[in-house]
């Protein structure tokens, strides 16, 4: 496997909470996929803070993933097309759907994700890998002095 790209993102939890409040909860429905949304509602029912932290980590993971694959938030990368879920062990993993899944499969791209949160911030890091032959390394930039 070769590294296709890397991405990282940090989200301020209070900003995510403010957007969620301002939109009457629609922000979560816009950003989270169906499985993520179920987890968000369950966590938020137990603890408002944990629900908001979950939303912030998933928002951050989607941003980091979009950077790792080099698309940003442009088609076929959409908010709901990528979900970050957890194995029973707690290890996070990504699941793509629809045209994003097709786009990734055509390029042999898989990804590894990690998320973390503290009171004020949520951070994510994504390494996208491919089984395709790596592109040639860029030639070093030479500098001349005048």
Swiss-Prot record:
**Mind naming one GO cellular-component term on file for this protein?**
cytoplasm
A Pfam family cross-referenced in the UniProt record is ACPS
What sort of enzyme, by top EC class, is this? Answer: transferase
* Main localization category: cytoplasm
Extract the signal peptide range: none
Entries under Gene3D superfamilies matching the protein: 4'-phosphopantetheinyl transferase domain (3.90.470.20)
State the superkingdom. Answer: Bacteria
What EC number(s) are associated with this protein in UniProt? 2.7.8.7
The subcellular location is:
Cytoplasm
Reactions that this protein is recorded to catalyse = apo-[ACP] + CoA = holo-[ACP] + adenosine 3',5'-bisphosphate + H(+)
Needed cofactors, names only, are: Mg(2+)
User: InterPro entries, per this entry?
Assistant: 4-PPantetheinyl_Trfase_dom, 4-PPantetheinyl_Trfase_dom_sf, ACPS, Ppantetheine-prot_Trfase_dom
Q: Name one GO biological process term.
A: fatty acid biosynthetic process
Keywords in UniProt for this one?
A: Cytoplasm, Fatty acid biosynthesis, Fatty acid metabolism, Lipid biosynthesis, Lipid metabolism, Magnesium, Metal-binding, Transferase
Q: HAMAP family, from UniProt? A: AcpS
Q: Which family does it belong to?
A: Belongs to the P-Pant transferase superfamily. AcpS family.
The protein depicted here goes by the name Holo-[acyl-carrier-protein] synthase
Name its species.
Burkholderia orbicola (strain MC0-3)
